[in-house]
């Protein structure tokens, strides 16, 4: 096996420094905003059982009415979907449009920011699918060593 060239080492070091700076910036922002850490706050908000499913479903289907969205997601209760959509709307990921009709019609769709979040969620899902065999292997080794 050959030694890495000076150029390869320099590029790797530069990437490492860039990542360290990015992490430091994120952690410094958390300190500057007191208890509002942007990473912790957003991850907490979207890591519940229904938020990402709602975002991915709206991203796949576009504009949906409440009952259609509920049906597409599956076994979510009406109350939990209502709470989830309110939280996503409050954070600016989902928009809600109410039509003055009888019966009332309410439609939901992703905002531009919600579409951006969906793209990030898809990258995470791709990574998880790629890493799944290794994760399962690690879990099995951990269980055997307990």
Indicate where each model-derived feature is located.
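N-terminal leader segment of winged-helix/HTH proteins
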Residues: 1-46
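N-terminal helix-turn-helix DNA-binding core of bacterial DNA-binding proteins
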Residues: 32-80
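Generic detection of well-ordered alpha-helical segments
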Residues: 48, 52, 86, 115, ...
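Alpha-helical linker/hinge and terminal dimerization helices associated
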Residues: 56, 91, 120-135
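Canonical helix-turn-helix DNA-binding module
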Residues: 64-99, 103
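Basic, amphipathic "hinge/linker" alpha-helix immediately C-terminal to the N-terminal HTH DNA-binding motif
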Residues: 101-124
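Exposed, interaction-prone assembly regions rather than primary DNA-binding/catalytic cores
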Residues: 139-146
